[in-house]
Swiss-Prot record:
Self-association and partners: Homodimer.
Name of the protein: Iron-sulfur cluster insertion protein ErpA
Function field: Required for insertion of 4Fe-4S clusters for at least IspG.
Cofactor: iron-sulfur cluster
Gene3D superfamilies, sorted: HesB-like domain
Listed InterPro entries: FeS_biogenesis, FeS_cluster_insertion, FeS_cluster_insertion_CS, FeS_cluster_insertion_RrpA, HesB-like_dom_sf
Record-level GO BP terms: iron-sulfur cluster assembly
Gene Ontology molecular function, alphabetical: 2 iron, 2 sulfur cluster binding; 4 iron, 4 sulfur cluster binding; iron ion binding
């Protein structure tokens, strides 16, 4: 038996939200891309965008027939993490639960390693 470890978890809640957001679009190839950039109050920040391109080296994870795409540079900071979608009193948003982050800012959108 070959057990392949998926380096990032793409939750059902996140996949369901991505699916609902792209249903009205005219592009069946859209995927949610998560990436890391420098910035924010803690040094790095998460970014989310819809993308219909998968580049060489990108990791694609499928859930509920929708895809999550991560570039190789961002992947090294996200291994073991979870991409989720939450709704609450403070609003609704995609979130990354990242075990590699040693600290995060109050809003949770930036982190340090």
């Amino acid at each position: 038996m070959n057990d392949i470890q998926i380096p990032i978890i793409f939750t059902d809640a996140a996949a369901k939200k991505v699916k609902s957001l792209i249903e009205g679009e005219d592009n069946p190839n859209l995927r949610l891309r998560v990436y890391i950039t420098g910035g924010g109050c803690s040094g790095f920040q998460y970014g989310f965008t819809f993308d219909d391109q998968v580049n060489d080296g990108d990791l694609t994870i499928e859930n509920q027939n929708v895809g999550l795409v991560v570039d190789p540079m961002s992947l090294q900071y996200l291994i073991g993490g979870t991409v989720d979608y939450t709704e609450g009193l403070d609003g609704s948003r995609f979130v990354v639960n990242n075990p590699n982050a040693t600290s995060t800012c109050g809003c949770g959108s930036s982190f340090s390693i």
